[in-house]
């Protein structure tokens, strides 16, 4: 177990005799337990059993019952203390047998927390625990022993005792310092406990624990651990936690939107998708329902976005904001929020053909506690375009991913490319940048190592998050390339991080992004972003891509479509020639209500229904308990759960996957689920 080889018993006869004695003890104990016998002899027998086998979890219930039977409200305090001492003694002896016995630690907590009784030596309990934990490191040299100083049970019990004794957090922080500095840099629980204490003290603004000084002091402290024992992980986990606090604590709440501030949007009816090339270079939004999405994307999950916190300064009233999330309750936190704005030429606000819309945000609080203290406004312009009648044959033409693209006009770059806005000013922003820069310079001086390269890459990404000038991406990408060559065991993780950095590099500057942008003239010059053939394994930076209507991610190494749910304008998506293994990996596409064209051909999508390992933990597209009125073949179940929400889908390509997705049966299934579908696998469906 836990990678340890089972050793052969050197004294099997002695072991057999002990087992026989243990069975005899258990038999006598169970008899006493069932008959509710709580005599002195019975209690002593249970104590002997627990000391012999602390893992006999059921046996820990017996002393609790015996304890209750021996006491009442009028019990003499000296008797109470005597019984408590006896119970604590049994627990201590049991812990000497097995320091990681859940039952022993829980029983000790139960004894000390008895209501109506006060254990006068409670103050000594913390000192005893101090001595126990500090002496435990002596067993570290014995490879056959677990290291008790890293015992999670003991540290959990410590927090319980600290609460009872009202010990200060400053004293406990000093205790972790003593444990780490005097005993071992590798005590993970001490580092974890330290992070909890530091967070609390900084949040309370305790004396000497302002963010700037505290983070700098803690960074200097953890350097001793990570540079002394570089191969040990405990200190590195704490360092990464500190890095996260340096970047995120009180960071400005940033957001992007569509439409973005200052943009001009042309609204038109459904047939504009099939109109011939337009002369305009402005964003055209075509709608079959007479509405368009107003999208807010925050860099932190927020809740409570509503008509009271986001107001529309025009005749458009009573917008309903919905989180782009699988959770159905109204209190959900989400980074992406969407409202549907109705437009109708008969309405007064649209009779002018051009309407300015002002959106004001205020009173929003993120899940990290970041307050939008000052209101923020942005304004965009809507133009109503007269719908042009298009012949039926043109409406049903197939969308090609190889022809019909024009280069992006550099002179027509819209505000959409630079729409990320800081909502809050952070008074500590400069010292945070300085702290990250100091760490970068420090890690540049270290000899080459896997952990050193990984931390340097994370530090450079952290600085890019703060300054957003794109100067570090080339180095970051090279670091992850080096790591993939050095450490094949974690190749997929490095590849994912490389993909994130690459997409951020592409979207960091208008010059680099414009090289991937095109206009698709066969659909009224909608905006197409082509990120194909980049070996991407993960999607990122979608907050900068909200304006994209056509996205080509073909010939990459993607395993899922996670992240695309924020791109509410997407009407055409190409995910062909990737590594997607099931329709459940496409679950995020259910939120793309404008999607008309989907290409998932030449992946590894199979018909086997995946096992839903999250069924009892969170909502899942594989949990089908709410489905009624429709019988779906089991082999198409996960396909149904995705396709049923793509009601505007007109073109689907799923060639080159499992054979069950070919043939008349699947064609019939798709036409039932997606009634507007016209093209399947490159062939036009007959009426």
UniProtKB/Swiss-Prot annotation:
Catalytic reactions of this protein: geranylgeranyl diphosphate + L-cysteinyl-[protein] = S-geranylgeranyl-L-cysteinyl-[protein] + diphosphate
Keyword Repeat: yes
One Pfam assignment: LRR_1
Keywords: Leucine-rich repeat, Prenyltransferase, Repeat, Transferase
EC number: 2.5.1.60
Activation/inhibition comment: The enzymatic reaction requires the aid of the Rab escort protein REP.
A molecular function GO annotation: Rab geranylgeranyltransferase activity
LRR repeat placement: 523-545, 546-567, 568-591, 592-616, 646-668
UniProt key word Repeat: yes
PFTA repeat feature ranges: 38-72, 83-117, 132-167, 168-203, 214-248
Oligomeric and partner information: Heterotrimer composed of the alpha subunit RGTA, the beta subunit RGTB and REP; within this trimer, RGTA and RGTB form the catalytic component, while REP mediates peptide substrate binding.
Protein family (similarity comment): Belongs to the protein prenyltransferase subunit alpha family.
Function noted in UniProt: Catalyzes the transfer of a geranylgeranyl moiety from geranylgeranyl diphosphate to both cysteines of Rab proteins with the C-terminal sequence -CCXX, CXXX, -XCCX and -XCXC, such as RABA1A, RABA2A, RABF2A and RABG2. Does not seem to be a functional Rab-GGT alpha subunit in vitro.
PANTHER family: GERANYLGERANYL TRANSFERASE TYPE-2 SUBUNIT ALPHA, PROTEIN FARNESYLTRANSFERASE ALPHA SUBUNIT/RAB GERANYLGERANYL TRANSFERASE ALPHA SUBUNIT
Protein name in UniProt: Geranylgeranyl transferase type-2 subunit alpha 2
Species this protein is from: Arabidopsis thaliana
């Amino acid at each position: 177990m836990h990678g340890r080889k089972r050793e052969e018993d050197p004294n099997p006869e002695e072991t057999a005799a002990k087992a026989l004695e243990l069975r005899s003890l258990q038999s006598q104990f169970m008899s006493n337990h069932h008959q509710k016998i709580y005599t002195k002899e019975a209690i002593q027998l249970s104590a002997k059993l627990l000391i012999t086998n602390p893992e006999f979890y059921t046996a820990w219930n017996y002393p609790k019952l015996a304890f209750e039977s021996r006491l009442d409200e009028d019990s003499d305090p000296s008797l109470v203390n005597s019984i408590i001492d006896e119970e604590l003694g049994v627990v201590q002896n049991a812990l000497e047998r097995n320091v990681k016995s859940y039952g022993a630690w829980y029983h000790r907590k139960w004894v000390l927390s008895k209501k109506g009784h006060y254990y006068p030596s409670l103050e000594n309990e913390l000192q005893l625990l101090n001595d126990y934990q500090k002496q435990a490191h002596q067993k570290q040299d014995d490879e056959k022993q677990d290291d008790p100083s890293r015992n999670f049970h003991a540290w959990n019990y410590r927090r319980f005792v600290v609460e009872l004794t009202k010990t200060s957090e400053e004293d406990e922080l000093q205790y972790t310092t003593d444990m780490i500095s005097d005993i071992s840099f590798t005590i993970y629980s001490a580092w974890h406990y330290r992070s909890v204490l530091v967070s609390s003290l900084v949040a309370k603004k305790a004396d000497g624990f302002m963010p700037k000084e505290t983070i700098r002091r803690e960074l200097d402290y953890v350097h001793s651990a990570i540079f002394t024992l570089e191969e040990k992980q405990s200190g590195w986990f704490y360092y990464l936690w500190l890095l996260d606090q340096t970047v995120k604590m009180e960071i400005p709440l940033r957001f992007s939107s569509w439409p973005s501030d200052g943009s001009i949007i042309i609204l038109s009816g459904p047939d504009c998708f099939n109109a011939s090339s337009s002369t305009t270079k402005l964003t055209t939004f075509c709608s079959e329902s007479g509405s368009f999405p107003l999208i807010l994307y925050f860099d932190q999950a927020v809740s409570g976005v509503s008509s009271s916190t986001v107001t529309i300064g025009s005749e458009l009233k009573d917008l309903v904001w919905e989180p782009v999330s699988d959770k159905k309750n109204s209190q959900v936190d989400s980074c992406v929020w969407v409202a549907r704005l109705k437009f109708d030429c008969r309405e007064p606000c649209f009779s002018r053909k051009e309407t300015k819309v002002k959106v004001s945000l205020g009173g929003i609080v993120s899940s990290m506690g970041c307050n939008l203290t000052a209101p923020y406004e942005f304004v965009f312009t809507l133009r109503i375009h007269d719908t042009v009648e298009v012949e039926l044959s043109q409406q049903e033409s197939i969308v090609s991913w190889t022809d019909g693209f024009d280069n992006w006009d550099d002179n027509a770059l819209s505000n959409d490319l630079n729409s990320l806005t800081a909502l809050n000013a952070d008074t500590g922003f400069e010292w945070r940048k300085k702290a990250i820069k100091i760490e970068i310079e420090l890690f540049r001086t270290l000899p080459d190592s896997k952990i050193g390269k990984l931390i340097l890459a994370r530090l450079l990404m952290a600085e890019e998050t703060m300054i957003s000038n794109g100067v570090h991406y080339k180095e970051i990408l090279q670091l992850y390339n080096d790591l993939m060559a050095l450490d094949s065991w974690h190749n997929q993780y490095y590849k994912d991080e490389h993909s994130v950095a690459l997409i951020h590099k592409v979207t960091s500057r208008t010059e680099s992004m414009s090289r991937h942008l095109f206009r698709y003239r066969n659909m009224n010059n909608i905006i197409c972003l082509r990120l194909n053939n980049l070996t991407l394994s993960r999607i990122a930076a979608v907050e900068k891509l909200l304006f994209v209507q056509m996205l080509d991610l073909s010939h990459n190494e993607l395993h899922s479509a996670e992240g695309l749910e924020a791109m509410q304008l997407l009407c055409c998506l190409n995910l062909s020639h990737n590594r997607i293994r099931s329709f459940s990996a496409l679950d995020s596409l259910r939120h793309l209500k404008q999607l008309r064209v989907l290409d998932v051909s030449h992946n590894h999508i199979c018909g086997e229904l995946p096992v839903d390992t999250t069924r009892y933990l969170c909502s899942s597209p594989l949990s089908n308990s709410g489905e009624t009125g429709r019988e779906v073949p089991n082999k198409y179940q996960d396909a149904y759960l995705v396709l049923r929400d793509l009601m505007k889908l007109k073109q689907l390509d799923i060639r080159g996957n499992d054979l069950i997705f070919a043939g008349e049966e699947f064609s019939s299934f798709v036409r039932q689920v997606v009634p507007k579908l016209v093209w399947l696998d490159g062939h036009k469906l007959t009426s």
